Structure formats: structure tokens, C-alpha cells
Amino acid sequence: MKIEGTAREVLEKTEWVAIATCGSEGPHVVATWGDYINAIGIPDDRIVIPVGHMHKTEANLKLDNRIELLCGTRQVQGTYGPGKGCSITGTARMHTEGQDFDAVRSRFAWARAALVVSVEKVETQL
């Protein structure tokens, strides 16, 4: 599924992105900066996120590769005023080599992996 229109605008202007996975102990949420995602670039159907720690996220993805991202910004006009959100669901895995990892490491020397999200559903909110 493509990230386009208002959803793309929200993702490009968001300050932070929440990342939710689920493992044997239940749901787990971490976050990353929107600038990190935008520095890598946003292809139409996937999102690449630099990974510093996120060890529990990685363990959860090995058990269940489903993921949900949530972002928002007041820079995009919402239905009732300033502010629009976006929920992105899909599947993900950690890459420690290859093109996506190389792109992440070239910009973020501290990154130990690239979290690559294959987008399956995009919903705007607010």
C-alpha cells in the first residue's frame, strides 16, 4: 500500500513516531524521531527507521512481525482544527546488512540495524 496524500504529509512533518509491537509479555511501544525517518527518505510502500537499541521490539518481531506506527502533527490541517494524525500498519523486520542498512548507517553511525516496515494499511486520524 502506498503512503500518499495527507498521510505522507503528516509523516513528513511529524516530530516523532510511536512504534508498537506485541510479544509474549503483551504490547510494547517505543518511539523514534520523525527527522530520522525523513533523513532516510520515505518510499511509497515502506518505511525505514534507524535502530539504536529497540531490543524488545526486535524480539517481539521475531515472534510476530506485525507492527503499527502512529504519528501526528499540528502542521497539517485536521477535520476540526490544526492537527492531523496517521496510523500505519504492516509487517517489519530488522536488517543488519543490505541496501536499507547501508542507507541508515551512512546517516546514523550509531545505528545497529534498520527497521524496515512494509506498509499494508494507512489511516488518517483527527
What are these regions (language model features)?
Residues 1-126:
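Binding-site signature for planar aromatic cofactors or substrates
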